[in-house]
Amino acid sequence: IVAVLHSSEGVAGTITFIADSQIPLTGPNSI
């Protein structure tokens, strides 16, 4: 779900999403 927001940043955003998957709401690229 949050991955959609990260998709705008491309692959880098997706990788960050995976790294922040445990804390997606607290991640630097969450919202």
UniProtKB/Swiss-Prot annotation:
Coiled coil: none annotated. Its EC number is 1.15.1.1. It is an enzyme of class 1 (oxidoreductase). One of its GO terms (cellular component) is cytoplasm. Its main location: cytoplasm. It catalyses: 2 superoxide + 2 H(+) = H2O2 + O2. Keywords: Antioxidant, Copper, Cytoplasm, Metal-binding, Oxidoreductase, Zinc. It comes from the Eukaryota. Its cofactor is Cu cation; Zn(2+). Binds 1 copper ion per subunit. Binds 1 zinc ion per subunit. Belongs to the Cu-Zn superoxide dismutase family. Destroys radicals which are normally produced within the cells and which are toxic to biological systems. This is Superoxide dismutase [Cu-Zn]. The lineage of its organism: Eukaryota, Viridiplantae, Streptophyta, Embryophyta, Tracheophyta.
